[in-house]
Swiss-Prot record:
InterPro entries: DUF3194, MTH677-like_sf. This is Uncharacterized protein PYRAB15120. Residues 106-118 have a biased composition (Acidic residues). Belongs to the UPF0440 family. Transmembrane segments: none annotated.
Length: 118
């Protein structure tokens, strides 16, 4: 399964680009293992590719192999994990764009809930 999302941002440093890829990979791996036991996963590969030109392109590719007896829709699980990774990366990039800098990966990996106004 592969998805590409185009994100418009000012130019990021090499360290920030690496951080984006690492965050996406960590979110995907954690999501998969939140839904499957490690013993249920025979093989897993998570690849993040980032291309920065006029736009910032993040391509995530995920492969998960489980034994036949594991009753899970692997494609749906991968889709959900990728969607979650894009949400977390988007939040991280918004923080960077607002000038908050690298407030820590842990904050970027928390659930995305904005405080209610009013």
């Amino acid at each position: 399964m592969k998805k590409v999302v185009h994100i418009g941002l000012p130019k990021l440093s090499e360290d920030e680009l690496i951080e984006v890829g690492e965050i996406a990979q960590k979110v995907i791996i954690n999501y998969i293992f939140d839904h499957l036991a490690k013993s249920e996963v025979r093989d897993m590969e998570v690849t993040a590719r980032i291309n920065q030109g006029e736009t910032l392109d993040l391509e995530l590719e995920v492969y998960v192999e489980v034994p036949i007896f594991v009753k899970v829709d692997v494609e749906s699980l991968i889709d959900e994990a990728i969607d979650r990774a894009y949400e977390v990366v988007e939040e991280y990039l918004r923080k960077l764009a607002k000038g908050k800098g690298n407030e820590g990966r842990e904050e970027a990996e928390e659930p995305l809930e904005e405080p209610e106004e009013g």
